[in-house]
Amino acid sequence: MTVIDNHGVLAKDGELSEASARDYFELLKPRVMSLVVFTAFAGLVLAPGHIHPVLGTIAILCIAVGAGASGALNMWYDADIDAIMSRTANRPIPAGRIAPSEALAFGLVLSGFSVVILGLAVNWLSAGILAFTIFFYAVVYTMWLKRSTPQNIVIGGAAGAFPPMIGWACVTNSVTIESTVLFLIIFLWTPAHFWALALFKMRDYEAVGVPMLPNVAGERVTKHQIVAYAVLTAVCAVLPSFLGFASLGYGLVAAALGAIFIYCSIAVWRMPDGDLKMIPAKKLFGFSIFYLFAVFSALMIDRLAPVLVSHAGGWF
């Protein structure tokens, strides 16, 4: 296998690259990994019960490594299209800094390591969900869904939604309705988030033949779908209050954040077809990231606030 960009042959299998530690770190998709770590940590915090801090730290590290491993496998498989798309052309493999075979080996080793250590140190249910998540993202999404259906993000979004469920399972050794709701918040959030990106990166996706919804169904259909998923996400995000594992205060915060999320999605819906600047889509993409962090932060604050207040009361 050979990686080629506009300047010719950049890296070949069988040749040792001169990659730096930073290049290998970039293979892990650190921005995506940070969101995975954050939501997994939220699952740990929100779960009833207790986990030893050392085991909790090991769990988070294993989840982070597993997420990074799936990112490396994704970059290995997608090197051909990454070399063409402007936002991915400088990734380590298409840029020639890491050979594809090295990236594959790196991803496989980290995958096995993260799953085995999580199983041995914490429990095998959480390790099993982590293994399934890696497989789903690297194989089901990357190798099949991404290039075959405009619903790639809808179905494939499950991979990014599992981390809080894994964190929850690390503490409880179970999958519950509460952890399923945490899963659903991210699962329903994903289409609006990524289709906003797909709108202002339509040409990139068209150039590499990835059937993102805007390229297949058009801007108008995509905008309707974005609004629909924003509404579903906002509704799902207030469910913890109704199900009793978050307070009314959290519910009000989630409702306010959801209203802004829906407002931003409606701004995208109102955007004229063919708009070259795509400013509403870019704003929605940016806010959607803040929204998810804010919702899970609010959940954790809601969970920890009574504990912190009770401890503070003991100091006076």
Curated annotation (Swiss-Prot):
**Record's catalysed reaction(s):** heme b + (2E,6E)-farnesyl diphosphate + H2O = Fe(II)-heme o + diphosphate
Note in the entry:
Carbon 2 of the heme B porphyrin ring is defined according to the Fischer nomenclature.
Question: What is the name attached to this protein's record?
Answer: Protoheme IX farnesyltransferase
Q: What class of enzyme is it?
A: transferase
User: Which stretches are transmembrane?
Assistant: 32-52, 53-73, 93-113, 116-136, 152-172, 180-200, 221-241, 252-271, 289-309
Instruction: Give me the gene this protein comes from.
Output: ctaB
Q: Does the keyword Cell membrane apply?
A: yes
The family classification in the record reads: Belongs to the UbiA prenyltransferase family. Protoheme IX farnesyltransferase subfamily.
How does the record say this protein sits in the membrane? Multi-pass membrane protein
Subcellular compartments: Cell inner membrane
What function is annotated for this protein?
A: Converts heme B (protoheme IX) to heme O by substitution of the vinyl group on carbon 2 of heme B porphyrin ring with a hydroxyethyl farnesyl side group.
Query: Which UniProt key words apply to this protein?
Result: Cell inner membrane, Cell membrane, Heme biosynthesis, Membrane, Transferase, Transmembrane, Transmembrane helix
Q: In which pathway does it act?
A: Porphyrin-containing compound metabolism; heme O biosynthesis; heme O from protoheme: step 1/1
HAMAP family from the xrefs? CyoE_CtaB
